[in-house]
Amino acid sequence: MIIPWQQIAPETLDSLIEAFVLREGTDYGEQERSLTQKVEDVRHQLKCGEAVVVWSELHESVNIMPRSQFNGVD
């Protein structure tokens, strides 16, 4: 189930994004980006709809994923 990011408390959203960035360990090319930059990248993806916050009932957990990879029912 998609959780609208706008309905998440700002501090909680910050923590979710930061945990996601730290867990992903994505390679950003030749120039390493700071944690702050990576967090802002994910925040931008949420704002423009490229990424979504998802609740998994099965795992009882929240995750951030590309909208294109989400195949659940809203």
From Swiss-Prot:
Coiled coil: none annotated. Pfam families: UPF0270. InterPro entries: UPF0270, YehU-like_sf. NCBIfam families: PRK04966.1. Belongs to the UPF0270 family. This is UPF0270 protein NT01EI_3666.
